[in-house]
């Protein structure tokens, strides 16, 4: 009976885990759809912003190239605040460490800025002297404005660095995400010098260009953030689906084991009862 009770309690525990993983899978799937919509909107906005910049940039001597008397490179590493998403965080951490080694082998001094505390927790002991800041509670970022407030709150000035790179898990499909690095500064803006007409700027041209360039960089980073969020939710959907399937398989085995144990217990009881009757009859 003790064995049956232990099996029953274990089955109850597995059923509870199964419900939890199923709910988490449904929540992550809903969040994934929301992030995909935000990502599509951000890409459309970025496309229009790129058109404006491509139309109005008429000189190669713009402020988008950043200062040339600096050796520091800023790496913005995006992960998640929570686990239970497969190897999502492990992939970006492994990729980031490899990329940092590559930059340092070229004589570059690397500084780190983290979105999501999981990658920070995995790397802080090794790169503590290089970390500028870490942003946790990133699930509270619901739009571009809240994203900018997160960045401005850090006090990090991008113009201090000769280059700014963002490392994130790029979202391709629900089952395919890949660690990627994209260059934010110097900006890869197409330079057009054959405009049909020129424009008058108010305020001054360089001020307009500087504002547009900053907006361009922030939008690139925001899109990378959304790509990373989509990858996180996608990885969690797959991980929870796998966990749910595993609990089903485990529950099936436990039910079979429980039924066999109960059958054996019933058989044992019947044998004892029959043996008792037989012994009474013999008397």
UniProtKB/Swiss-Prot annotation:
Domain of life (superkingdom): Bacteria
Annotated InterPro entries: ATP_synth_F1_ATPase_gsu, ATP_synth_F1_gsu
Gene Ontology terms: cellular component: plasma membrane; proton-transporting ATP synthase complex
Main location group: membrane
Membrane topology according to the record: Peripheral membrane protein
Gene Ontology biological-process annotations: proton motive force-driven plasma membrane ATP synthesis
Pfam families for this protein: ATP-synt
Keywords per UniProt: ATP synthesis, Cell inner membrane, Cell membrane, CF(1), Hydrogen ion transport, Ion transport, Membrane, Transport
GO molecular function list: ATP binding; proton-transporting ATP synthase activity, rotational mechanism
Places the protein is found: Cell inner membrane
NCBIfam families: ATPsyn_F1gamma
Subunit structure: F-type ATPases have 2 components, CF(1) - the catalytic core - and CF(0) - the membrane proton channel. CF(1) has five subunits: alpha(3), beta(3), gamma(1), delta(1), epsilon(1). CF(0) has three main subunits: a, b and c.
Biological function: Produces ATP from ADP in the presence of a proton gradient across the membrane. The gamma chain is believed to be important in regulating ATPase activity and the flow of protons through the CF(0) complex.
Family classification: Belongs to the ATPase gamma chain family.
HAMAP family: ATP_synth_gamma_bact
Protein name: ATP synthase gamma chain
Organism: Ehrlichia ruminantium (strain Welgevonden)
Organism taxonomic ancestry: Bacteria, Pseudomonadati, Pseudomonadota, Alphaproteobacteria, Rickettsiales
């Amino acid at each position: 009976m003790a064995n049956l009770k232990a099996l029953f309690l274990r089955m109850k525990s597995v059923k509870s885990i199964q419900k939890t993983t199923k709910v988490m899978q449904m929540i992550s799937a809903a969040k994934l759809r929301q992030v995909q919509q935000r990502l599509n909107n951000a890409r459309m906005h970025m496309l229009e912003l790129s058109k404006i910049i491509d139309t109005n940039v008429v000189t190669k001597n713009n402020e988008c190239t950043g200062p040339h008397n600096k050796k520091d490179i800023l790496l913005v590493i995006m992960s998640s605040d929570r686990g239970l998403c497969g190897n999502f965080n492990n992939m970006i951490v492994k990729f980031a460490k490899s990329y940092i080694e590559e930059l340092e082998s070229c004589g570059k001094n690397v500084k780190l800025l983290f979105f999501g505390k999981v990658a920070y927790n995995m790397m802080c002991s090794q790169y503590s002297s290089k970390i500028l800041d870490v942003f946790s509670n990133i699930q509270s970022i619901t739009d571009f404005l809240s994203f900018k407030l997160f960045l401005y709150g850090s006090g990090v000035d991008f113009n201090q660095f000769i280059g700014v790179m963002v490392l994130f898990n790029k979202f391709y499909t629900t089952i395919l995400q890949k660690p990627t690095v994209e260059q934010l500064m110097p900006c890869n803006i197409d330079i057009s010098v054959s405009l049909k007409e020129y424009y008058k700027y108010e305020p001054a041209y360089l001020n307009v260009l500087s504002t547009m360039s900053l907006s361009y960089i922030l939008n690139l980073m925001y899109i990378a953030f959304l790509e990373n969020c989509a990858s996180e939710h996608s990885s969690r959907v797959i991980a929870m689906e796998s966990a749910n399937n595993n609990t089903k398989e485990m529950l099936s085995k436990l039910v079979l084991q429980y039924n066999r144990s109960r059958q054996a217990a019933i058989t044992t009881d019947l044998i004892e009862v029959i043996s008792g009757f037989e012994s009474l009859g013999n008397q």
